[in-house]
Design a protein with these regions (language model features):
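Surface-exposed, flexible loop/turn segments at secondary-structure boundaries
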Residues: 13, 60, 75
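A generic structural signal for short beta-strands and their flanking turns/coil linkers
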Residues: 4, 26-29, 48-50, 63-65, ...
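Short, charged beta-turn/beta-strand-edge "cap" motif at the junction between a beta-strand
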Residues: 52-61
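Aromatic- and Lys/Arg-enriched surface recognition patch
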Residues: 66-136
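Compositionally biased, charged N-terminal/linker segments
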Residues: 1-48, 57, 145-146, 155-156
């Protein structure tokens, strides 16, 4: 299957690119996604080797680097822990509702690319992220969009 590309959002105060970079083996599971469409992307579509744009959301939304999918979708165990912020009493190990993937740090951009700057790039005019009202935390991007953003960011 051909490589696909994704944008994954995270609040930098919760989990930043530096956190991924500092994980053992620079790898971590992407848990806590509680939107059905984003869940379906992770469960059904993401494959090992797919490229990821790591996006810091919040007060200063910006793309900060890249990662790779290193494990396909599997049940998100945080949904089963009542002490976890992502707990969902309807999800069980026997009937999981939520899924996650594992990603591995790949690169940090020399300069983060703010959302506002992305809006000014003609090659990105159709990007899902830039559509009004889009709040998905995981979304597909085209190879052209991925390559354009990586080129803009430059690797450290």
């Amino acid at each position: 299957m051909a490589t696909r590309y994704w944008l994954m959002k995270s609040e930098p105060g919760e989990y930043a690119l530096d956190d991924l970079k500092n994980e053992p083996d620079q790898t971590e599971h992407w848990d806590g996604v509680r939107n059905y469409q984003a869940r379906n992307f992770m469960r059904d579509d993401m494959q090992v080797g797919d490229g990821v744009l790591f996006y810091h959301s919040g007060k200063k939304p910006e793309v900060v680097g890249t990662a790779r999918v290193v494990r396909t979708g599997y049940p998100d165990h945080t949904a089963w822990d009542p002490k976890n912020n992502h707990f969902d009493p309807k999800s069980t190990p026997e009937n999981p509702i939520w899924f996650m993937v594992d990603i591995k740090f790949e690169s940090e951009f020399k300069a983060p690319i703010p959302l506002k700057a992305l809006r000014d790039v003609a090659a990105l005019k159709d990007m899902i992220l830039l559509r009004r009202g889009n709040r998905l935390s995981v979304m597909p991007v085209t190879k052209k969009e991925f390559d354009t953003i990586v080129k803009l960011g430059g690797k450290k």
